[in-house]
Regions:
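Conserved recognition-core residues within compact binding domains
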Residues: 2-145, 152-178
Length: 178
């Protein structure tokens, strides 16, 4: 790795002969400075000084086609921290590994929900929700889905991701037989 340029928010690195812009990922509402994530879903470990592979999980769609997704384990070490429903818990003196989907890490880092309305919501509507309806915004932020436009869960490039409602996500999946 060759560090080309670095400022407070973005880091440009030369990885495998390509200049790749990276940022510290936002996971579970916090910025993690031990990793960097690119727009294409590559994750760099600052402590190991290398790209990390992540864990590949497999599932089957309705047509028995194998669908592979990539997850990364991150270390969480805050006092009295509780997870977001996954059952992970941190108590004093222990560190827990949490798993985060690569597509969620890319979207939350490069296209934060606050600045990028979900598909089907206009900017004008989104500004009203953010400003005047915090309970609606919180509900949306907890229930919104991230969809892979090309239906390939291993393709975590920002250009292949979009936020959709659970209803739209289920409709699209049924329509495509996934």
């Amino acid at each position: 790795m060759n560090l080309i340029d670095m400022n407070a928010n973005d880091i440009t690195m030369c990885i495998e002969g390509k200049d790749i812009e990276m940022k510290h990922p936002i996971c579970f509402g916090k910025v993690y400075d031990k990793w960097l994530v690119s727009r294409c879903g590559k994750v760099w470990s600052m402590s190991r000084n290398k790209l990390i592979k992540g864990h590949t999980s497999h599932s089957y769609n309705k047509n028995n086609k194998v669908m592979s997704a990539i997850d990364y384990a991150i270390m969480v070490s805050e006092e009295n921290w509780w997870g977001d429903g996954s059952g992970s818990k941190h108590t004093e003196g222990y560190q827990w590994k949490r798993s985060i989907n690569a597509h969620k890490m890319v979207m939350d880092t490069w296209a934060p929900l606050y600045d990028n309305p979900p598909e089907g919501i206009t900017w004008k509507e989104w500004e009203i929700v953010r400003r005047d309806l915090p309970s609606v915004y919180n509900h949306i932020s907890k229930t919104i889905c991230i969809d892979h436009i090309d239906d390939n869960p291993a393709n975590n490039h920002l250009d292949n991701l979009r936020r959709v409602t659970p209803r739209d996500n289920n409709h699209t999946r049924k329509k495509k037989g996934i």
